[in-house]
């Protein structure tokens, strides 16, 4: 699998990053043995980049087990989750992550979401100390707006940013991507398949299990789902004409966007690993990108997560 450098002076990472949210149970129950097999299959396919988080349920624990004996070849990214950015919690969080991941350092340690109640200067100062201590190698951000990114970079250098970015939901992140590109900050795009929506797998009226967080997203139900699903089917038809499918198209499209270093793809099965591998090998031409853009047109929905009424 191809690799790209993450940021100005960061590590070389595979163009597909293994997104470990699903193996933590965020999208329903996952058999741990199957999850570990999937992780090993991804490594065999050339994936050297793994993204997890403190808040991904059992994800760090499963990943830690799977990477035993393989850690030296892996670029590992995790995140400080939750609303507490106090010095004490940051210390507890990194130590817990190191313990369950069975490692003594994390390559990219990211702030999962902005927390305006905590001064960014204090938070970044503590991350710099962790870097000096060797517990983390690089600092990253996740889900930060361009204004929030600018504030963070005023405190210290940032290696990566992790915005939500995909074929359908991409309008709100453009300013962040451009700032990062101009300032040598690597982009790890998440939700490239829109939580599975861009696979074409889900039909109208699909009911998610109680332990599947996707039941909270507005685009999996109602009129918005119908509109997006119709578009996904059209994109799938276009991809099939090229002996591909819409899953591969969605990943390849993200990788074709100039600022993107790596596309984070959630994987729970061996087939999903294979789809990701095939996607990484598809270099969309400018002509093809234009055709895809014409299919999508001016449709720019907003990403909303809310309680199901």
Predicted regions and their residues:
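Acidic (Asp/Glu)-rich catalytic clusters
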Residues: 7-10, 64-72, 95-102, 131, ...
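Active-site groove signature of glycoside hydrolases
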Residues: 98-119
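Beta/alpha (TIM)-barrel catalytic core signal, keyed to glycine-rich beta->alpha loops juxtaposed to Asp/Glu
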Residues: 114, 118-294, 299, 308
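Short, acidic/polar
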Residues: 29-42, 86-101, 145-150
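Hydrophobic residues in well-ordered beta-strands that form the structural core
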Residues: 51-52, 76-78, 141, 187-189
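A short, structured active-site edge motif that brings together acidic residues
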Residues: 73-85, 108-111
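N-terminal binding-site loop/beta-alpha segment at the start of enzyme catalytic domains
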Residues: 1-74
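Active-site mouth loops of central-metabolism enzymes
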Residues: 21-32, 79-88, 115-118
